[in-house]
Regions:
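SIR2/sirtuin-family catalytic core signature
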Residues: 1-9, 20-23, 43-146
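Active-site glycine-rich loop that binds ribose-phosphate moieties when present
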Residues: 27, 31-44
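Active-site-proximal helix-loop elements at catalytic-domain edges
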Residues: 9-32
Length: 146
């Protein structure tokens, strides 16, 4: 992961595994502790990235103990940093919990409709966002107004 720190590429971090290798996925408290101990350098890089990049949490929960600790440490040690974002279906996180996430972890919640029940609306929204970002990049490159 370190080689990507100086890269202009976007990075998808699958901190606790991927469905492509389910045997390496992390679910239990013991597995979290073991991973934190055996991958200490990863968590140091994660600490740095939290301070220098904007994170969008997508397809995960809000109760990951390692991520909670990392975000809370950064929030209280370095006040005034720009927020990170957590994307979830409407109604899955209460208004009070959203306030707690912002106050303690500097996370703003972005909600989307999930009428279908299979999150297809999220995919549509992400595709639309991608098109808008591409258009804006072209506009900025042509006008040099950044």
């Amino acid at each position: 992961m370190a080689k990507y720190l100086r890269s202009n590429d976007y990075l998808v971090i699958k901190a606790h595994g991927t469905v492509d290798e389910t045997s390496k996925m992390i679910f239990t408290h013991k597995q979290y502790s073991f991973a934190r101990y055996n991958n200490a350098s990863f968590y140091k890089l994660l600490d740095a990235l939290i301070l220098t990049h904007t994170f969008i949490f997508l397809g995960c929960g809000i109760n990951d103990p390692d991520i909670e600790l990392t975000l809370e440490n950064a929030n209280f040690l370095y006040e005034g940093c720009l927020p990170h974002y957590f994307v979830t279906a409407n109604g899955s996180i209460s208004g009070n919990m959203q306030k707690v996430l912002l106050a303690n972890r500097n996370i703003e919640v972005i909600s989307y409709d999930n009428v279908s029940g299979n999150h297809s609306e999220l995919l549509e929204e992400l595709q639309e966002l991608s098109q808008k970002v591409d258009s804006k990049r072209i506009e900025l490159a042509e006008t040099s107004t950044w």
